[in-house]
């Protein structure tokens, strides 16, 4: 070190300084406490680093009792001053600097009020200074903030002050391994984990204490919904010999089998065969054409569903040991579910209620018989003029498919590109292919009103400030899907719903009720069949093995594919998401026109 500074970093030097400070403290008791107290307040009020170190010093200098008293009041006063500065002087700066964190804290305060602040003080999920600044922008009263902060920080203060008292007792380097100091460090490390566990247990007991727990349960787990998520959850639970109830009010197999993956891919396959006929000369054939009956095409779609139905049937799952109930579930409390007038008791509940097509409240939509991914499969006549409202995966797949069958298709998308979650060049490629297939892709068009004029139906859209009329015979509404959360007791029970409309879950797919879990479309954030199955494993295992073991749901590598032609597929994030999340990446491009397989196809 320059200027021989290393001589001040030895244990002997530090002990000598400690003795001098201790001697000064004994001779100037009030002055030392006052200066330290004021310094601590300034550090915390100014949101400067060093509060933790000063807490350790307080333990070393003042001992456990007085160190705790001094730090408790100084830290709370400083935190309150920072809170007031944020509220009245730095509101805009804090909002812009910590907006994302502030949203989480505001959400917690909105749900749990002062108890949320108490848990943050007890288990600091955010830095001490950030809580002070962020809380200044919430509506919490100053006196409540002070009291809750002082009580919430007291346990942590005692732990840190105690660690400081142990550090002060080191006389030699071998003292670092003394039981007292090692114990202090162990307490420091375990304190957040222990307090988090205590808080979670307290929250759970506070939530469940108003419900009578059954002396004996009919089932270990009851699964509501027999779609992809519910079937996999039931299968896994039955595999480990749990007693399982599976409840379905409609059809086994859910959306994937009956109105989603299976029928759409069957229809896409038929349309693709027709497109090959139109390209016969590319493959060395004389120009040819197919004659088709759309009614028979739709019959084939239903026949494919029938072939797959046994895989998801009541008989199969009954054979696996699952007790399948056909009827509508009503959750009476965290332990009881009513089905067709019968009440069953269960230790855990897994919600796999799925999602339904979202129909936006566009004026006039109630005057037309619109189609969705649920009702599309009932039509038997090919629409002459078809509007597909929405540029997501479902909208894109159906727009190209019906265009290939011969419908005059207009695809309406409010965003500047179709497949908005994909990279721009991917969207551009699909758009160009759609145009070749005859799809009129209208991006940047906002649907304003459906109008019925005699026998004609027209969608009025806004584009660049002007109204544009798009006539149609049928319209498929495919602007997204909304989680099914109403009508089976969640509102009455108080299960929390997220702002996005899905059921609120933690990283372990647990709701605010410790024995109620969610998987599939009802949980989000992905609405894929394979993701629903993926989540089902976590929801089932976490529910059956709580509180002894739990697994955080892993979404780091999620594959998905949109079955347009060409297909759009990826695994994990793309370039667009990497840029949005400020993730460094390396981009490698390989043109498919250089691929042997692509050329042969």
Language-model region placement:
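Membrane-interfacial helix-loop-helix
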Residues: 2-36, 72, 76-132, 137-138, ...
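Transmembrane helix boundary and interhelical junction motifs in multipass membrane proteins
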Residues: 37-66, 125-132, 153-159
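Mid-to-C-terminal Rossmann-like scaffold of FAD/NAD(P)H-dependent oxidoreductases
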Residues: 212-231, 239, 423-425, 436, ...
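Core beta-strand elements of the Rossmann-like FAD/NAD(P) dinucleotide-binding domain
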Residues: 217-219, 339-348, 465-474, 512
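N-terminal Rossmann-like FAD-binding beta1-loop-alpha1 element of flavoenzymes
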Residues: 218-246, 395-404
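Glycine-rich flavin
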Residues: 235-242, 247-382, 415-419, 425-426, ...
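Glycine-rich dinucleotide-binding loop and its adjacent helix/turn
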Residues: 261, 353-412, 437-441, 491-512
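FAD-site-proximal beta/loop scaffold in flavoenzymes
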Residues: 366-383, 469-549
């Amino acid at each position: 070190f320059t200027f021989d500074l290393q001589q001040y970093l030895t244990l002997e030097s530090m002990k000598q300084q400690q003795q001098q400070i201790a001697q000064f403290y004994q001779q100037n008791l009030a002055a030392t406490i006052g200066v330290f107290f004021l310094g601590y307040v300034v550090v915390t009020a100014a949101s400067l680093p060093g509060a933790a170190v000063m807490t350790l010093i307080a333990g070393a200098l003042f001992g456990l009792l007085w160190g705790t008293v001094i730090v408790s009041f100084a830290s709370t006063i400083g935190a309150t001053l920072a809170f007031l500065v944020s509220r009245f002087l730095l509101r805009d700066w804090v909002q812009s600097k910590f907006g994302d964190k502030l949203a989480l804290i505001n959400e917690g305060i909105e749900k749990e009020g002062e108890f949320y602040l108490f848990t943050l003080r007890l288990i600091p999920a955010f830095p001490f200074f950030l809580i002070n600044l962020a809380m200044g922008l919430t509506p919490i009263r100053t006196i409540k903030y002070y009291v809750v902060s002082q009580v919430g920080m007291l346990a942590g203060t005692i732990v840190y002050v105690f660690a400081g008292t142990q550090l002060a007792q080191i006389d030699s380097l071998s003292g670092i391994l003394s039981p007292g100091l090692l114990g202090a460090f162990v307490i420091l490390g375990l304190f957040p984990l222990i307090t988090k566990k205590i808080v979670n247990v307290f929250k759970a007991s506070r939530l469940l204490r108003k419900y009578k727990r059954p002396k004996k349960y009919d089932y270990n787990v009851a699964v509501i919904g027999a779609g992809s998520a519910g079937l996999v959850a039931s299968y896994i639970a039955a595999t480990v010999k749990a007693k399982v109830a599976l409840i379905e009010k409609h059809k086994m197999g859910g959306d994937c089998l009956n109105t989603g993956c299976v029928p759409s891919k069957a229809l896409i396959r038929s349309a693709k065969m027709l497109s090959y006929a139109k390209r016969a000369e590319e493959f060395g054939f004389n120009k040819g054409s197919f004659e088709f009956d759309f009614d028979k095409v739709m019959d084939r779609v239903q026949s494919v569903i029938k072939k797959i139905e046994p895989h998801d049937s009541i008989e199969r799952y009954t054979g696996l040991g699952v007790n399948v109930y056909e009827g509508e579930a009503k959750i009476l409390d965290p332990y009881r579910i009513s089905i067709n007038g019968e009440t069953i008791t269960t230790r855990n509940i897994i919600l796999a209620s799925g999602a339904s097509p979202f129909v936006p409240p566009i004026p006039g939509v109630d005057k037309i018989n619109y189609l969705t991914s649920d009702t599309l499969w009932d039509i038997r006549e090919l629409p002459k003029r078809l509007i597909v409202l929405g540029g997501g995966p479902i909208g894109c797949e159906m727009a190209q498919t019906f265009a290939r069958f011969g419908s005059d298709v207009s695809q309406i998308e409010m965003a500047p590109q179709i497949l908005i979650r994909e990279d721009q060049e991917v969207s551009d490629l699909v758009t160009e292919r759609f145009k070749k297939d005859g799809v009129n892709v209208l991006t940047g068009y906002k649907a304003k009103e459906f109008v019925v004029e005699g026998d004609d139906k027209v969608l009025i859209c806004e584009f660049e400030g002007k109204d544009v009329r798009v006539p149609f015979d049928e319209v498929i509404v495919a602007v997204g899907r909304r989680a099914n959360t109403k009508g089976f007791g969640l509102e009455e029970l108080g299960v929390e719903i997220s702002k996005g409309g899905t059921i609120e879950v933690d990283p372990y797919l647990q709701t605010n009720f410790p024995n109620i879990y969610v998987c599939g479309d009802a949980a989000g954030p992905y609405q894929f069949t394979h993701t629903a199955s993926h989540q089902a494993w976590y929801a089932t295992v976490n529910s059956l093995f709580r509180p002894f073991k739990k697994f955080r749901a892993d979404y780091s590598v999620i594959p998905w594919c949109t079955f347009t032609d060409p297909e759009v597929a990826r695994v994990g994030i793309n370039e667009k998401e990497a840029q949005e999340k400020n993730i460094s990446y390396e981009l490698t491009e390989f043109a498919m026109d250089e691929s042997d397989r692509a050329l042969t196809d």
